Design a protein with these regions (language model features):
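A short, N-terminal "cap"/entry segment at the start of jelly-roll beta-barrel domains
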Residues: 2-53
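Conserved short histidine dyad/triad with adjacent acidic residue
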Residues: 32-35, 50-75
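Residues in well-ordered beta-strands of folded domains
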Residues: 50-52, 84, 118
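Short, glycine-/Ser/Thr-/acidic-enriched flexible segments
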Residues: 56-57, 88, 113
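Short, conserved beta-strand element in jelly-roll/cupin
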Residues: 74-90
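Short acidic-glycine-tyrosine-enriched beta hairpin
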Residues: 93-110
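Ligand-binding loop in jelly-roll beta-barrel domains
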Residues: 111-126
Length: 126
């Protein structure tokens, strides 16, 4: 399993209004959200928001904290909202497994140490 992480800083509104298309894309577009057997996270200084994607194919993917969170586990001080945009899968939270289909959502509250993503079928990964 591999977790990729990037950090985006907030832009000054007076500067941002002068950005051309290329610069706007550089500052705001998250291009690599889904990749097989990877969790990709982008932390934005706008509201300290994390946008991420997980695509379990050959292995389960465990949501681990990244250094900037300064936490022992990912949901130590934050909540997670999940929307499945792929095939059927499961999310295991603290040992309880939730089935999640296409366009279904799951809320994970603060304080849950274990979050694991799995696909039901690797030919149609969640």
């Amino acid at each position: 399993m591999k977790t990729n992480f990037s950090l985006r800083y907030a832009s000054n509104p007076r500067d941002a209004k002068n950005y051309d298309t290329a610069r706007l894309r550089e500052e705001f577009l998250v291009e690599r959200l889904m990749a097989p057997d990877e969790i990709n996270l982008t932390y934005s200084m706008y509201d300290r928001l994390i946008v991420g994607g997980a695509m379990p194919v050959d292995e389960a993917l465990r949501l681990e904290p990244v250094d900037i969170l300064r936490a022992d586990y990912f949901t130590e001080r934050r909540e997670v909202g999940i929307i499945n945009v792929g095939g059927a899968g499961t999310v295991t939270v603290e040992g309880e497994t939730y089935a999640i289909g296409f366009k279904e959502a799951l809320y994970i509250g603060r304080g849950n140490r274990e979050v694991v993503f799995r696909s039901d079928d690797k030919a149609a990964p969640a």
